[in-house]
């Protein structure tokens, strides 16, 4: 099974991290690709791509620059995405397309309007990461949400996300929580710290270096099996 994750850019971000964790799961029988809509250009981008490629994930870079100024640029990127996605569809024939956050959501919606028959045999999964969607874009929200609801694609990451979405868009999405990987816990209250270093700094460093991941295989199976039953 060939799974394509659509993310905004190869850079640091919660949704990008979730997509990367799923793609790095190396589940038997699954081939993972990650596609960015706008070209990441932060200091973290090379590390992010290197991590994915080391795990055997194929990365598809965008030529559209990531301009962090106004959602207008994200909309332009989404409007230009269909031709690029057409090449991906013809070249790779994905079985599943999994979108994360509004820019990829909009890009896939535009593709579905330009090439409506290309997604007929493709399973669509859409993870909702935020409690607020499409701020200031009510008409865009109406179009995009109608598309994802028609594909039974929505998966919420928490109770608050599910409830917020249900209140605004009238659909109660199933929940698949973002998981936290097990890490060895140390008793920081009974260890000595270097001179001049406060214990809180050690604790914060532990939080910063803990490995966070998603229950990847289980999440995908539950999402796809749920959608298949609907």
Where are these regions (language model features)?
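A conserved, positively charged/aromatic
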Residues: 73, 77, 89, 118-156, ...
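Carbohydrate-associated surface elements
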Residues: 160, 179
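Conserved donor-binding/catalytic core segment of Leloir-type glycosyltransferases
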Residues: 4, 192-201, 205-222, 228
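Proline-aspartate-enriched helix->loop->beta-strand connector
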Residues: 93-95
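Short hydrophobic signal-anchor/transmembrane segments that target glycosyltransferases
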Residues: 23-29, 111-116, 199, 212, ...
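Short His-centered aromatic/hydrophobic patch
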Residues: 81, 99-105, 128
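A short, basic/aromatic alpha-helical/loop segment that forms part
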Residues: 12-13, 134, 182-185, 219-224
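N-terminal strand-loop element at the rim of the active site
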Residues: 5-73
């Amino acid at each position: 099974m060939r799974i394509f994750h659509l993310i905004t850019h190869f850079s640091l971000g919660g949704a990008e991290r979730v997509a990367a964790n799923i793609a790095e799961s190396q589940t038997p029988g699954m081939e993972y690709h990650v596609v960015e809509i706008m070209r990441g250009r932060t200091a973290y981008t090379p590390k992010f791509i290197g991590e994915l490629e080391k795990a055997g994930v194929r990365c598809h870079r965008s030529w559209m620059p990531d301009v962090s100024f106004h959602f207008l640029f994200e909309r332009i990127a989404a409007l230009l995405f269909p031709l690029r996605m057409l090449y991906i569809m013809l070249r790779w024939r994905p079985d599943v397309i999994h979108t994360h956050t509004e820019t990829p959501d909009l890009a896939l919606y535009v593709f579905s309007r330009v090439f409506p028959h290309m997604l007929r045999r493709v399973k669509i999964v859409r993870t909702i990461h935020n409690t607020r969607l499409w701020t200031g874009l009510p008409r865009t929200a109406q179009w995009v949400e109608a598309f994802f609801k028609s594909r039974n694609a929505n998966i919420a990451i928490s109770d608050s996300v599910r409830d917020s979405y249900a209140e605004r868009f009238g659909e109660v999405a199933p929940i698949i929580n973002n998981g936290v990987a097990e890490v060895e816990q140390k008793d920081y209250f009974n260890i000595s710290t270097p001179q001049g270093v406060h214990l809180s700094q050690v604790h914060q460093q532990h939080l910063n270096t803990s490995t966070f991941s998603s229950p990847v295989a289980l999440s995908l199976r539950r999402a796809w099996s749920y959608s298949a039953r609907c």
